[in-house]
Amino acid sequence: MLNLQPIEYVGRTPSRPKKKHPNLIGGWVLLLMTLGIGFVIIRPMVPFLQSKRAHATKANAERAIGELKESKDFAKRLAAAALARTTEIVEYDSGYYDLSYPGGDIPSHKGICADLVVRSYRSLGVDLQELVHEDMAENFRLYPQLWERKEPDSNIDHRRVPNLQRYFSRYGKELENSPSIDDYEVGDVVGWRLSFGALEQGGSHIGIVVPGPGARSDEKWVVHNIGSGPEWEDKLFDYEIVGHYRFAPGRESSTASAENEAGISPTPH
């Protein structure tokens, strides 16, 4: 019978495995590398993202309207009313329509630059159709004589830019046609002369000064309809300015009274 003897182990003494600690330095390096790569990729996109927030979008219009419409300042509420027009789809139409009076309007999906101004004021309770007609009925000779008319016409007179300019100059505050942006305020009405302007408008155009969109809200933009419907654009100085007015209801005008008494003829536009 074999006599088996135990064999002595002569290798290394077994030891408990050491607990490994995480490599914190390597983790931070990886994190910093990730952030650096992200910065390099995203940084060039920042101006683009900022510009997107400053576009004349419907969302930006609604945001601006919300900020302006509750103001006690009539001019700011007028700017809100003008911006509200930009959310509507309007086909350019300068045609003659038979309108009710007062408060008459052509179909809401049609219009020109003058209609935009008339509708903006009317939404605040100021009916330029009635105001212009009443003044022309009393002082027809003081208005531009560009259409071979012998008497006022409540269907069309308030839709003609030169007539609106004349009314604003008589009953509002007529301001300098300044080249400086600082001389214009939100809610001002501006008249331009266009080289391509419609003959029935005397080559004139009209719009309302409003804030710029989003991050550009400190800028002075305009709402106008130059053929593509109501638009919110940075175009205050893109055309020759020939009229600058500030008109709010209830403001007494010494200009109109003096002109009526003196029989002063209108300034050509």
Regions found by a protein language model. Give the residues of each.
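N-terminal capping segments
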Residues: 11, 23, 44-165
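Short, basic, low-complexity termini and linkers enriched in Ser/Thr/Gly/Pro
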Residues: 13-14, 18, 265-267
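N-terminal Sec-pathway targeting helices
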Residues: 15-34
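Hydrophobic alpha-helical membrane-insertion segments, chiefly the h-region
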Residues: 34-45
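...with weaker cross-activation on analogous glycine-rich loops/strands in unrelated enzymes
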Residues: 74, 137-223
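A mature extracytoplasmic/lumenal domain signature
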Residues: 130-134, 194-196, 226-227, 248
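Low-complexity, Gly/Ser/Thr/Pro-rich intrinsically disordered linker/tail segments
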Residues: 217-269
